Design a protein with these regions (language model features):
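Bacterial N-terminal signal peptides
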Residues: 5-14
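Sequence signature of WD/YWTD-type beta-propeller architectures
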Residues: 20-315
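Flexible loop/turn segments at secondary-structure boundaries
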Residues: 242-243, 265-266, 286-289, 425-427, ...
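C-terminal functional module detector
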Residues: 324-343, 348-351, 356-359, 364-368, ...
Length: 801
């Protein structure tokens, strides 16, 4: 049954919420961050040709395009579609006799291996166990398939006998084993092993003996190709500012020969049957994939242009026009055939891993090719418009126009929407420029975007773009930096004039691995430049103060917070739990530290499988005619809300977020608006929920009011919470919105009982953090770090007693 598209868009989902997004596809237990597993290892789909597989007779190349498989005739340059249906097909591999293709079929939450008989068109599912199946390749005798399959320790290699159906385990080693390439001797297999380092390995099928041909770190788009004679490997490898395609000798792999280099990776290289050419797919500056080839001995890459596409069916187009208030409006779109197969635009498309939807963006009008027949369309703008859907019929050889009028449930005048933590490029199949964000920002109704430059282990990504193409007029687009000490915690820096160095340190890195350096040095760096330092994606559990949960908090965070050296906390992020992070934030507020609530989606815009920037965002109240400097001032003053969807306009004692009021009996109001359901609204005083009111059963608005007894010190805020995912426009695990606090008496005031309990709670987390630090730094002189923990402990103990 098709599982794509509109079910997730038209109504709330029935599935219970997870604490945060964890995985769309079956989990691989050893893999801690499925966003990378799904982003790097699962197929990329697009309108243009990907996954080239030259035929054994040298006359054609099988490719994936528009979610189906096609055969490109190399003489006529005509592509003929050979698969159909609602699922998305990718990664074709030829049988040695050229009569069959094996491929990956993606059903939006599961994969399987299918074999297609090209003479009859018959398909046979040959591998469909629970868990991921990827990367089929026929054995040299054509009687079996090698493929990758999930197991308890990761993803291993399997060999399937196509006659008997028997499956043999080739390798179940800890880690990932992908992209098997049978050696022509029939006795070995080349494959990509990911076990800490990423390695291209050659394995004996008889003995299991292996040797590594190449080793690197986070080879995100690397998939090896083996020459027909088994002597040469073609390999895409990352550079600091792009990718290269190299050749290496199987027997002496250390020297390499560069064939080509560029910004975007040369994806899925494959040798022609005669070994004379290497085919690959590559995205251009327009984010359109093209089929390329280069002589195996070197030379200029050439495009293998497809002159005609034979769909095997009548074809037309659908033109979608989106408006708000009668005027053309940018939008996020999802288009599909009547049976649920996604329709791909000519440019970049993405896969929403929360809802299982392929989407793109439109400036207000977009035309997409489609088979004649029924189509379904959904559109939203940002988080403020409920999904509008329509069905239409595409005429053969003609166009059908679909008009969708979007209606925001709230008016954001006087507020600016921002995402302060996402990445332009981060190892995905595209090489994006800053201007490539413009369509996304418009469709997501974002006014401020600060993509962060960051490292991919020992490579610095986008550092060459630092300071480039900044926009001062709204929407503002300005790079920030993510300083990524995996051990101490990641810190995002925005509003800075220069980059902090080093970008990385601490256990796990080859250089600066036992450095006596604090995250607080990066915070001080940002403060000196008038910027903001934020601990990003800080808490992945619902209650970080539960027994044993303290290890979920970044090692240095509590120490920095206790010493007042923490500017901001990323309260909403796709990869962490918003409610759990709020609990940590509450304790810091209760110490009297006016920690700014921040929001960042942490998506990677050059991935195919990623949610959109602004999926988690903040709204900052700036009034009319504000500048970017005004925005930053308001952000620092706490005049904001963070959200995954709902909107809250809060007044407590007449003051908005960031304001100051007196204690005692105080009236409050909240305007709640949401493009989807949200279960409840809660009033929070010094971290305790003191009043709960019903939210919204469906998209709309509600005015709420009440009165609350306030102590003489501390803070009060309002939040909105939902218990399950709601579908578009949301791409988050559950609805959550939180207004920044209104302070009682003065900014930074405290309630003695709440302050005392906060210190006690934070001391338990500090115990866990310090224990982790001492275990990692055993025998290492680190006086600055030890002094930081000591001073933080004294500060907390002085309050807790």
């Amino acid at each position: 049954m098709p599982r794509l598209l509109l079910l997730a868009l038209a109504a709330a989902l029935a599935a219970p919420a997870h604490a945060q997004w964890t995985n769309r596809y079956p989990a691989v237990p050893i893999y801690s961050h499925h966003v990378y597993l799904e982003g790097y290892e699962l197929p990329t789909s697009a309108a243009g040709p990907t996954d080239p597989a030259p035929s054994p007779d040298g006359r054609s190349v099988a490719v994936a395009a528009r979610g189906w498989l096609w055969l490109v005739d190399l003489d006529t340059r005509r592509a003929r579609r050979v698969t159909s249906g609602p699922a998305v097909d990718a990664r074709p591999a030829w049988s040695p006799d050229g009569r069959r293709l094996a491929f990956v079929r993606d059903r939006s939450d599961e994969t399987e291996i299918v074999v297609l008989d090209l003479d009859t068109g018959a398909e046979r599912v040959v591998a469909s166990a629970p868990g991921l199946e990827l990367d089929p390749a026929f054995t040299t005798d054509g009687r079996g398939l090698l493929y990758s399959a999930a197991h308890d320790n990761g993803i291993g290699l399997r060999r399937l006998d196509l006659e008997t159906g028997a499956v043999e385990v080739v390798s179940d080693a800890l880690g990932l084993a992908l992209a098997a390439r049978p050696h022509p001797d029939g006795e070995h297999v080349l494959y990509l092993a990911k076990r800490g380092a990423d390695e291209v390995r050659l394995r004996s099928l008889a003995t299991g003996a292996e040797r590594a041909l190449h080793s690197g770190r986070i080879l995100s788009q690397t998939r090896p190709a083996l020459a027909p004679d088994g002597r040469t490997v073609a390999l895409p490898l990352p550079l600091d500012d792009g990718w290269e395609l190299v050749l290496m000798d199987v027997d002496d792999p250390v020297p390499t020969v560069r064939l080509t280099a560029g910004a975007a990776p040369p994806l899925a290289p494959a040798f022609s049957a005669d070994g004379q050419h290497i085919y690959f797919s590559q995205a251009g500056a327009d984010e359109r994939f093209r089929l390329m080839r280069i002589p195996a001995e070197g030379g200029e890459p050439e495009r293998v242009a497809v002159e005609a596409w034979d769909w095997g069916a009548e074809v037309g187009t659908v033109t979608v026009r989106t408006t708000i208030g009668g005027a053309p409006a940018p939008a996020r779109l999802a288009l599909a055939t009547a049976d649920g197969h996604p329709l791909f635009p000519d440019g970049q498309a993405w896969f929403d891993g929360q809802n299982g939807v392929v989407y793109t963006v439109s400036p207000g009008e977009l035309t997409v090719r489609a088979p004649a027949g029924g189509v379904r369309v959904a559109a939203v703008q940002g988080l403020a418009t409920p999904a509008v859907t329509a069905e239409a019929t595409v005429p053969a050889g003609g166009d059908v126009a679909v008009a969708l009028a979007l209606e925001p449930v709230w008016d954001a005048d006087g507020w600016l929407a921002a995402d302060h933590h996402f990445h332009l490029n981060y190892g995905g199949p595209y090489a994006l420029d800053p201007a490539d964000l413009d369509g996304l920002l418009a469709a997501e109704a974002l006014d401020v975007a600060t993509p962060l430059v960051a490292n991919l282990h020992n490579r610095y990504v986008d550092d060459e773009l630092w300071g480039a193409d900044r926009t001062d007029a709204f929407p503002v687009r300005e790079f920030g930096q993510e300083v990524r000490s995996h051990f101490f915690g990641h810190v995002g820096l925005v509003g800075i004039d220069s980059l902090f160095h080093p970008w990385i340190w601490g256990p796990g890195y080859e250089v600066f691995g036992d450095d006596d350096r604090e995250n607080a040095t990066a915070t001080a760096w940002a403060r000196r430049q008038g910027g903001i330092s934020t601990y990003v994606h800080p808490v992945g559990v619902r209650d970080p103060f539960a027994e044993g949960a303290g290890r979920s908090v970044p090692v240095e965070l509590v120490a920095d917070g206790a010493l007042g050296e923490l500017d901001a906390l990323e309260v909403v992020c796709l990869w962490t739990d918003d409610v759990g992070t709020a609990e940590l934030w509450y304790r810091l507020l209760n110490l009297g530290h006016a920690v700014i609530p921040m929001a960042g989606s942490d998506v990677m815009s050059n991935f195919y499988r990623t949610m959109a920037p602004g999926t988690t965002r903040l709204y900052v109240a700036v009034g009319e005619d504000a500048s970017y400097a005004d925005y930053l001032d308001s952000l620092k003053a706490g005049r904001s809300i963070v959200t995954t969807g709902p909107f809250l306009d809060v007044r407590i004692g007449g003051a908005g977020p960031g304001g100051v009021i007196e204690g005692g009996r105080t009236e409050w109001t909240a305007e709640l608006a949401s493009a989807g359901p949200v279960d409840r609204v809660e009033v929070v005083v010094n971290g305790a929920i003191v009043e709960t009111l019903p939210g919204l059963a469906e998209a709309g608005r509600r005015s709420l009011r009440g009165a609350v007894d306030l102590p003489d010190g501390g803070w009060v805020a309002v939040r909105a919470v939902g218990d399950r995912a709601t579908g578009w426009p949301s791409m988050a695990a559950y609805p959550f919105a939180h207004a920044a606090p209104v302070w009682i008496g003065a900014v930074g005031s405290t309630d003695p009982a709440a302050e005392r309990q906060a210190a006690r709670d934070l001391l338990r987390v500090l115990d866990a953090s310090e224990a982790r630090f001492e275990a990692a730094y055993r025998g290492v002189e680190a006086p600055r770090l030890r002094d930081r923990f000591s001073r933080a402990r004294r500060a907390l103990e002085g309050v807790a007693e």
